[in-house]
Structure formats: structure tokens, C-alpha cells
Amino acid sequence: MKTPSPNLVATLMLAGALAATVRARAQAWGLPELSKESKACLECHKQDNTGVYQQWGASKHHRANVACFECHMANEGEPDAFLHEGYRIATIVSPKDCARCHSKEAEEFANSHHSKGARILGSLDNTLAEVVEGNRGMKTPGFPGGVSAAAVSGCWQCHGSEVKVLANGKLDPATWPNTGIGRINPDGSEGSCSACHSRHSFSAEQARHPDNCGKCHMGPDHPQMEIYYESKHGIAFRAFKDKLNMDSSKWVVGEDYNLAPTCATCHMSATPARPANKDRPALPAQPVTHDVGMRISWNNRPEISVRPEISDKKLGLPGAEVNWQTRRNHMKAVCVNCHEQQWVDNFYVQYDSLIDLYHQKFAEPGLELYKLAKPLMNPVQFANKLDWTWYELWHHEGRRARHGASMMGPDYTHWHGTYEVAKHFYSKMVPELEELVQKGRASGDPAKVAAAEALAKKLDEVLNQANHNWYLNKMDPAEKAERERRQQEFQKRYAK
């Protein structure tokens, strides 16, 4: 690059002018022309990074004359700022940088659970990746004592790393590259816009595609992508994805497309105003939102599902003031563009009933039993069979059941969900609890004997409840007789 170095004042003036131009709407969108700084960047990078240059060239940023320097510019004193060919820049473009033009989106994102994704230290998931699966074998300047490669290449790539800037200005290789949704950036901001808006094309069509979300929302513990593709929504998307106008600037369900929803449709995208009818009041239009929790009415992440305003309060988010009923109405305003009101209302009855079943039959008694078993167990996490059984029961199988019901995935609700929960509750957890009771009673330790008696009493109480008494062969005789009659009829129809 041969362009002379701009001084700090010029850099600050450019940043201010860019933000002011956008805020004041001096023109429809973008800048009047490419800045001389970005032109200088492009002289080299169109040769050195052809793919980056071509992606940007096909993007709306290119059409808006927003280029390298407008995004990568940095101020003196920023932790990751460095001089490059006379320009002060930063490698990482953080949400704070994107907010120069996209302030509304950045604020909504900052108020979402997505931006807090890296706050996983201390979780059982993190213990698994760092200790049980991992070791301290990956040593870097930022982690001289070592860090787990399983955490670096696994958890952190979705949840986000805490990016460390080294003494020489470079970024620690354990923490970068990283586009995790909750990445903690050197400028103090949380999140990564490029988790969804992949650089350097920043395609709305790609961000709206279900596979974009599926990078993280998949697998045994949160298989939203697999559930979506099993559902009628996913089937419709595969059939009609070329007819959904997914590259449209304005993308309003019921106006710009109607043949299928994507994840973005339900959780983020705009909805039109709808007049009142006999089943509901008038619905105002909803704008696009980057707070993906504003339309969900259950947080299904923990052992026992909680209402989203409760988890928002724990994170100190403004959503603590938005109750689940309001959020559900926001989601229903999406649904009614393709479904009539009774269909929508009845779906939520089904969904809530599955949550209640999971809670009442397995999660609530299971959690209480697990806590009572703790004094009889090795205190080291995941050093006991029961640790693994209980963890997978709620973290994998229990989530699959709940997520399956939330997105109309029957196989994930039943066979991958409640079936697995029940199988492991009765065939693993109950026998493991009984074994702990037996060992505790025989230990000779008064504290363990007392703990064993308390656990035995609770287990007996749980198994004698109506939800579980079939296990003790105590099912109501009339119901038992009726089920035997149905089984006989089934055998007559299908037995050879």
C-alpha cells in the first residue's frame, strides 16, 4: 500500500462521519463513495485474498461503499489495535464495531442469550470438555499452563472464546480464530455478528437458512436442526426453498413468502399487521429482532424448564421485564400467518402438556433423588455412574423430548426423547439409587446410613406415585385389564 498514514484525528473523524452519515440518513443507505483508506486496502487484498475480495464484491456492503477500513478501523488504545501499512486497524470486527451502522441490531443482540454464550465456565458441559475429556496439553502464550483442545475446538467454537491479545499484538491461537456467538472480544463487547452473518458476503439469504443455525443447534443435546428437518416446516422448506425469496431485502412472512418458515421466520423475522377476527384481537406488525428469546415461552436448557424471564433476570438482561405470555403472543403472531387460531392455541396445549409430563414424572423427582444420593457418592463430578445417567437423562434425552415438542418433531419427542428418558430412569437410575441405598446401609457410617434411609424413603414414595406404580405392578386393575384387552386385539390383527 502506498497511501500515506492517516493520523488518529483523521481516523476518529472518519469513524464519526460514517456513523453520522448512516444515522442522519444523508442518503438511502451507505456512503457516497469508497474511502481512500479502503481503496488502499483493496490494492493488496484483491491480490492476496482473492476469495475475500470476491465475496465482498458480491455483498451489499460493496454496493453501499462500505469496505475494509470502515469495519476494521480502530482507535489508539484499543487492546487489539495495531498499525498495518500505516493504518490503525483491528483483526476482529466486534458487535461494537458493527453498531456504528447497525445500532438497533447490536443493542438487541447484546440483550439476548446469544451474546452471553461464552459464560459457560463452571457448567457441567465445561467440566466435561476441560477435565473429563480434555487435559492441559494445548500450551500457548496465553495459556502457558495449558488448556483443553477439546474446549478450544469444541465448546468455544459455538459458545465463543475470550479472545486474548498477546504482548506482540497478535491473538492467542487458543482463542482465535473463533466466531462463537458469545465470544468475549478485546474491546469488552460480547458476541460475534459473523456467527450468523458470515464474512465477507454478509448474505441475508445465508443468515435466514436453517443450516446457518444448525452449526450450533444440532447434536444429541440440542438437535433443533434435526427436529426442524423432521417437522412439516422442514419438509416444506426443502420442497420450496427456491420459492421463498430468501435474498429479499424485505422478508415478511405472508407478504414476501408463504410456503415454509425457517428458524429466522419464527424467532427473528418481521410479521405483518393482521386485523381482528372472532378468535383474536388485531395484531400489530412486528419488526425484525436480534433478541432471539423474545418469542420463546420456555427455556428448555436446564434440568427443569423455566420461563424465559427468569433466566433473563439471572443474566441481568432487560428481558426480565417481558413475561412468557407476552413472548408467546409474539410467536403466535408469526404462526397465524399460516395457521388458524385454534390450530395455534391447541399446539401450545400439546407443547405445555409435554413439558408438564417431563417435569412431573421424571425431572422433578429425578433431581430430588439425585440430590439425596449425593452424600452416598464420590464427590468428584462424573466419577459415579449416577452422574452420567442423570446428566444424559436431562441434558440429552430430556432436552430432545422438550425441543421435539416445541418444534413438532414427533420422533425426537418420543423415541429420541421420552422413550430414552423413561428407559434410563427405570433401567439405570432406579437400580443405581437402590445400589447406593444398599451400600450406605451397610457402610457402618451413621451419616451414610441416615442418608441411605432418606434416599430409600423418597425412592419408595416416588415409585408408589400414580406416575410410576406400574413399575411395582400396582397399576389400577381396571386400567391393567383394559390394556391387556387391547394388546390381545392387537396380536389378533398382526400376529402370524
Language model regions located:
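Bacterial N-terminal signal peptides
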Residues: 10-19
